[in-house]
C-alpha cells in the first residue's frame, strides 16, 4: 500500500477501475500505483487503460508534485510511470517529481529488496534516448534505492506538438491508425505487467523494442537541449480577443497552473518558468483563440477524445 500525506486533495478508491479525487481528506491508503502526467490526453488514456487491466491506482503527478507526499510500499507492490516525451526527453515536471518522490518499504524488507517498476511513454513519432535518461535519473535519486525498472514500453500516439514549422496534428486516418496500434500494444504490455515476466540477466522487458527513431543520441542530446532552452516557454502564447469567449477552459487544463484566468476572464500567462509547452491550452480551446506566436496559425487541434478534422 502507499501512504500519501496531502492537505487539500487525495486520490481515493471508490471503484476498482475508476479512481477519483476527493477534497479535504487528509490521509488515504492505497496499493499498486501509477504516477502519470498528460497534456493532451494520450498518456492519460494509456494510464487509465492500463490501470483498468492491472488494478493499479492512478496518481496524477501535477496533483501531488507540490504536496509533501510520502509513499510506503508493502512487499510485492509495484509502481509505474506514464508520461509523454517532450523534445525527445523526459518532461521537466516528471524530472522534478522524481527528485521529490520518496518511497519507503515496509519494515520487514531489507535494503536489497526492490519493488517492481515499469515505465510507459507516449510520443508522436519517436522517443530518442528519453528512456535511458529516465533510467539514469531514477538510479541517481533516492527513490531509485527502492525501485527496479523491469519493463518499458513506448506508444506512438497522435501528434500534438505544433510549435515548429512543418509540425502539425495528424490527419483523421493517421490518428485512428495510431490509436488502434497503440491499443494492441498496450494490451500486450498489460499482460507483461500482470505476469511480471522475468527475463533474468538484468534485462528490462521491451528495452530493445522502444521506438527510439534515427540517431537517437543526437535528438535527445543537442536537439533536446535546444528544445529545453529555447522552445519550452510560455512567452509566445497569446489569445485572440475576438475569438475568446472567456470560458476558462485553458486555465483549467494547464497542468502547472501557468495561466491566470477562469470563467469570465481572458487567459493571461504568468511566465513563472513552469510552462511545459504541452499545448494543452491551445488544443483544448473550443474557439481556437490561442496561438503560439505565428507558428500555430492555420494548424489543427488535438486532444485524445476529439478526432482531428
Task: Locate the predicted segments by residue.
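Active-site-proximal loop/hinge segments that shape catalytic or ion-binding/gating pockets
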Residues: 302-307
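Iron-sulfur cluster-binding cysteine motifs and their immediate structural context
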Residues: 239, 245, 249-276, 280-297
Amino acid at each position: 500500500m502507499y501512504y500519501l500525506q496531502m492537505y487539500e486533495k487525495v486520490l481515493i478508491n471508490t471503484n476498482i477501475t475508476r479512481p477519483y479525487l476527493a477534497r479535504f481528506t487528509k490521509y488515504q491508503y492505497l496499493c499498486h500505483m501509477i504516477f502519470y502526467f498528460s497534456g493532451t490526453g494520450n498518456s492519460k488514456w494509456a494510464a487509465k487503460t492500463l490501470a483498468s487491466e492491472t488494478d493499479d491506482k492512478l496518481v496524477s503527478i501535477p496533483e501531488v508534485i507540490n504536496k509533501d507526499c510520502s509513499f510506503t510500499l508493502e512487499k510485492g507492490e509495484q509502481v509505474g510511470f506514464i508520461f509523454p516525451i517532450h523534445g525527445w526527453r523526459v518532461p521537466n515536471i516528471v524530472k522534478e517529481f522524481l527528485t521529490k518522490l520518496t518511497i519507503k518499504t515496509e519494515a520487514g524488507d531489507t535494503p536489497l529488496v526492490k519493488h517492481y517498476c515499469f515505465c510507459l511513454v507516449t510520443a508522436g513519432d519517436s522517443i530518442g534516448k528519453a528512456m535511458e535518461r529516465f533510467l539514469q535519473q531514477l538510479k541517481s535519486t533516492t527513490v531509485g534505492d527502492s525501485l527496479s525498472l523491469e519493463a518499458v514500453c513506448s506508444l506512438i500516439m497522435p501528434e500534438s506538438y505544433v510549435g515548429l514549422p512543418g509540425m502539425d496534428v495528424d490527419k483523421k486516418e493517421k490518428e485512428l491508425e495510431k490509436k488502434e496500434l497503440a491499443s494492441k500494444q498496450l494490451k500486450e504490455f498489460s499482460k507483461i505487467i500482470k505476469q511480471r515476466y522475468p527475463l533474468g540477466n538484468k534485462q528490462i522487458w521491451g528495452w530493445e523494442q522502444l521506438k527510439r527513431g534515427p540517431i537517437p543520441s543526437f535528438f535527445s542530446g543537442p536537439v533536446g537541449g535546444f528544445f529545453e532552452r529555447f522552445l519550452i516557454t510560455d512567452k509566445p502564447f497569446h489569445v485572440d480577443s475576438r475569438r475568446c469567449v472567456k470560458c476558462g477552459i485553458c486555465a483549467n487544463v494547464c497542468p502547472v497552473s501557468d495561466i491566470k484566468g477562469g470563467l469570465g476572464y481572458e487567459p493571461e500567462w504568468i511566465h513563472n518558468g513552469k510552462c511545459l509547452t504541452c499545448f494543452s491550452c491551445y488544443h483544448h480551446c473550443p474557439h481556437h483563440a490561442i496561438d503560439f506566436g505565428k507558428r500555430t496559425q492555420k494548424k489543427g487541434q488535438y486532444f485524445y477524445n476529439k478526432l482531428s478534422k
